[in-house]
Amino acid sequence: IEQLALQVSWADFNSPEQLEPEIDEQRLSASAIYTVPLADEGWWSTTIAWGLKDPSEDETMHAFALESAYAPDRDWTFFARSEVIESHELGSGGTIDTVGKISLGAIRDFHVMDNVKIGIGALYSVNSVPDELEPSYGGDPDGAMVFLRLVAGT
C-alpha cells in the first residue's frame, strides 16, 4: 500500500537525564501514517503513534497520539490532534500521572513563488490533567496560538 508508511524504533540510553544520571532508559516507538491524495490538489493524512519509556528505576510509561489533517486544496489545511502521555515529572511527588491534550486548527497558505509558501495558522487546545495536579496547572487549562509557517522546496 503506497499510501501507508510504518515506523518502529528502539533505543537504549545510558544516563539520558542530567538530573537523574544513575537511571538508564530503554525507549520504543511505533507509528503509522496513511495519506490519500484528493481532487483539486488536496489530500488527507492520518497518523497514529505510540511510545514507551522504560527507566531502569521506575515504572514503564506510555504515550499515544492520533492526528489527522485535511487539505481540500493547495491553500487550506485543517488539522486535529489528540495525545495522552504518562509521566512522573509533572509535580505530584514522582508518581506516574496521565495527562491529555486535544487540539484543532487551520492553516491558510499563500504561494509567494513556485516552490515557496507562507502560511498563517491558528490552533486551540484543551488539556486534561488529574485532579491532584489541577491546583498546579489551574484546572484543565486551554490555550490558543497564531503562527506563521514558511515552506520552501515543495
Segments predicted by a language model, with ranges:
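C-terminal closing repeat unit and adjoining cap/tail of repeat-based domains
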Residues: 105-123
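Low-complexity, intrinsically disordered Gly/Pro/Thr-rich segments
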Residues: 128-135
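Detector for outer-membrane/organellar transmembrane beta-barrel domains
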Residues: 1-93, 102
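Flexible, glycine-rich linker and terminal segments associated
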Residues: 90, 115-120, 149-154
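Short, glycine/charged-rich beta-strand-loop motifs at protein surfaces that mediate ligand recognition
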Residues: 90-96, 107-109
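Outer-membrane beta-barrel "beta-signal"
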Residues: 104, 138-154
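Extended hydrophobic secondary-structure segments that form protein cores and membrane-embedded regions
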Residues: 8-9, 48-50, 118-127
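Flexible, surface-exposed loop regions and adjacent strand-edge segments
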Residues: 23-25, 97, 135-141
